[in-house]
Amino acid sequence: MTEVASSVVYEVLGRRAQDVDEPIMDYIINVLADEDFDFGEEGEGAFDAVGELLVAAECVSDFEECRLVCSKLSDKFGKHGLVKPTPTVRSLAMPVRMNDGMDDGPVKKKKPEPVDGPLLTERDLAKIERRKKKDDRQRELQYQQHVAEMEAAKAGMPTVSVNHDTGGGSAIRDIHMDNFNVSVGGRDLIVDGSITLSFGRHYGLVGRNGTGKTTFLRYMAMHAIEGIPTNCQILHVEQEVVGDKTTALQCVLNTDIERTKLLEEEIQILAKQRETEEPTAKDGMPTKDTVEGDLMSQRLEEIYKRLDAIDAYTAEARAASILAGLSFTPEMQLKATNTFSGGWRMRIALARALFIEPDLLLLDEPTNHLDLHAVLWLETYLTKWPKTFIVVSHAREFLNTVVTDIIHLQNQKLSTYKGNYDIFERTREEQVKNQQKAFESSERSRSHMQAFIDKFRYNAKRASLVQSRIKALDRLAHVDQVINDPDYKFEFPTPDDKPGPPIISFSDASFGYPGGPLLFRNLNFGIDLDSRIAMVGPNGIGKSTILKLISGDLQPSSGTVFRSAKVRVAVFSQHHVDGLDLSSNPLLYMMRCYPGVPEQKLRSHLGSLGVTGNLALQPMYTLSGGQKSRVAFAKITFKKPHLLLLDEPSNHLDLDAVEALIQGLVLFQGGICMVSHDEHLISGSVDELWVVSDGRIAPFHGTFHDYKKLLQSST
């Protein structure tokens, strides 16, 4: 009997059973082969007895599949006659009196039957634990391999610097790239792509998170696409500058390598001239030093002419102007780069790129690390950019301002549209409508012709008509069916309980970090469940600090901050995205964050924020920035918070995802307080604007557009 049971179990479990330790398989088989074992309805008894073990041993992927497997086991065991028959109910021949045959003596309690040992022995549990650790090590190894590949790719990026040499070949104009493919990790992102970048045009690259926008930019930066001229300077602003003792200003100036070398040579020659200054020989003949001095003077003259030709003397002013536009004060420009945070070093990288003016500039979310003042300056600067650039951005208004064309990446294809993002959206919508109409018309024609052909195919009298229909069907133009992107969703859970107002209250609260000056004085405000607030102000003014005071991560130096004992606060920031375990997958990450919660419940919650299907099982290092943000949102909102504190929540999301985020925030049944400079997000999801400046918080009476116009007029 056990041999038959063994063959059935291995047949149902298939290949996965071969990877399970023998003691565990023996235990499962012996439990199911017991002659008194009751499989129950649809294998429920088997699920109760060995279901947890099957999942733990990875014989099945989850409990849902486990139920199906247990049902199959029940059926298979039944076909082999190994299932205990269900007892039938028979009618009694005559009534029975329940007290017949019973004496009045005390009833002896039946001793409980000995229960089998634990489901698994300690040895078996240890084996399962070792298997889990082995899987963790394997995931970590794959992640480290991915990191090494990325570092190698970055190391392979060509060094780009200011190019003053216009004599080495013709100037770069239009760039034609035809029939190219882009893939990563064996997955095709662009297939048979073709695109022409016209000189001086400003392109916005749009598409869903994970479609391959950043990878496409990297391919171009590495000249990995045929059609890019070898002498074309391409600069991809992707990573922050490495911090060292070089000042921010000098870091930008150092990109002009020729200028730097000429200035260094000038200093060396001047020093040498001072050392060798001596009168001529007594006989009036020039000495060796005099001849060398003449040569040095001649070289100095050449250096000065070249420095003048390459505008070397205006370079410092140009670099300082760019840094100032990106919110660097004169004092900050003279600070060492290793004293700046990652966000500020990213600004220095952007400043270097703008100073270099490459033939093709590639910008990936350039506004992520900028405040509104810097964004407005960058908009103006890029609008006047004389060469070609491609920008990826989630900021709709930014794209509307700076781009002249849109490149749309969808379904592994690239399409180009004239105009800004709003024009693209209208054009694309009309195009999709027309394509759908053409497809439906074509299908109706095909169906009508095919019906005629099928009806009269064997009718000799209509043979000629049938043949003409067949030829017409072959000639009928093929129209592709419209494949729409799946709808995005951000469904934030509704809190079960609602604490009374105010849930957060500041009363004369002041704050300063230990040993430093007060950043805020006498703050007085309250936040309720119906609050919809956006805080705006320059970077470094303390907006994120206020969010930490609200959440309780920081305590006021004086005054009080009241928080309702029942309030649950969720905080989203770039720190939460950066803190994800990239070697894990979203589902496993959530299971570790919330142990004991059923897998299906966690899957459902991930799905409510757009992390569905296979995406929930992909290693997180393969996810795009926007997809990682969704996982971070899932983690912080699982406990059904009453208040969402959001620090730049739209960073890394694509434009459709920002739209879905707006809808999710509008429907959220709780309070919202965000820090953002995204005009579309703020205008669509909040109704209060707070301006942070000079250690105070003041309400702004107007729209975000009004605030933006006020800033523009002041600069």
From Swiss-Prot:
Keywords: Acetylation, ATP-binding, Nucleotide-binding, Repeat, Transport. GO terms for molecular function: ATP binding; ATP hydrolysis activity. The modification N-acetylthreonine is found at residue 2. Residues 175-436, 504-713 form the ABC transporter domain. The keyword Nucleotide-binding applies. ATP 1 binds at residues 207-214. It comes from the Eukaryota. GO terms for cellular component: nucleus. It holds the Pfam family ABC_tran. GO terms for biological process: defense response to bacterium. Residues 96-118 are annotated as: Disordered. ATP 2 binds at residues 537-544. Belongs to the ABC transporter superfamily. ABCF family. EF3 (TC 3.A.1.121) subfamily. This is ABC transporter F family member 3. It comes from Arabidopsis thaliana. The gene is ABCF3.
